[in-house]
């Protein structure tokens, strides 16, 4: 628990991608106070530029493919083309909806999100600009496959 200092938490997590937010959510379930530091958007590469947008685009391609092959199962349908503006709008809506849901969940769990680039400055502390966050239990490095 905190000791009265707003920048002291049980757990300080550097990175808010899939590993970081999963850790933060579980820690909050266990009653830990949690700060999560992110220089981009909560959800990381997977949600914003990787897994989720790719799967949304693949879903649109599968719909087009099924439409093109509909006659083979007795369904009369024609594929008149692919509207890439519409496909990208669909992808963006999927990402936006999931991001809103995730940020709402993080907020509802009382997790503090600190925007900025964090730097490990001690075994129990991370510096974000002029702000120093101290962890009483652990600092978790969840910066992805490589730091940038």
Region spans (language model):
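Glycine-rich flavin
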Residues: 2-9, 26-32, 37-148
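Glycine-rich Rossmann-fold phosphate-binding loop(s) that bind the pyrophosphate
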Residues: 15-18, 39-40
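Short glycine/serine/threonine-rich phosphate/pyrophosphate-binding segments
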Residues: 19-23
């Amino acid at each position: 628990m905190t000791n009265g200092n707003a920048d002291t938490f049980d757990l300080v997590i550097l990175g808010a991608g899939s590993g970081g937010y999963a850790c933060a959510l579980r820690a909050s379930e266990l009653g830990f106070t949690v700060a999560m530091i992110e220089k981009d958007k909560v959800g990381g590469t997977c949600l914003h530029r990787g897994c989720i947008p790719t799967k949304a685009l693949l879903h649109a391609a599968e719909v087009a493919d099924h439409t093109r092959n509909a006659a083979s199962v007795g369904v009369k349908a024609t594929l008149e083309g692919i509207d890439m503006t519409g496909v990208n709008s669909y992808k963006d809506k999927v990402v936006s909806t999931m991001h809103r849901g995730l940020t709402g969940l993080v907020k509802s769990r009382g997790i503090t999100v600190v925007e900025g680039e964090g730097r490990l400055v001690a075994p129990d502390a991370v510096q974000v600009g002029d702000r120093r966050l101290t962890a009483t239990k652990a600092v978790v490095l969840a910066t992805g496959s490589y730091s940038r």
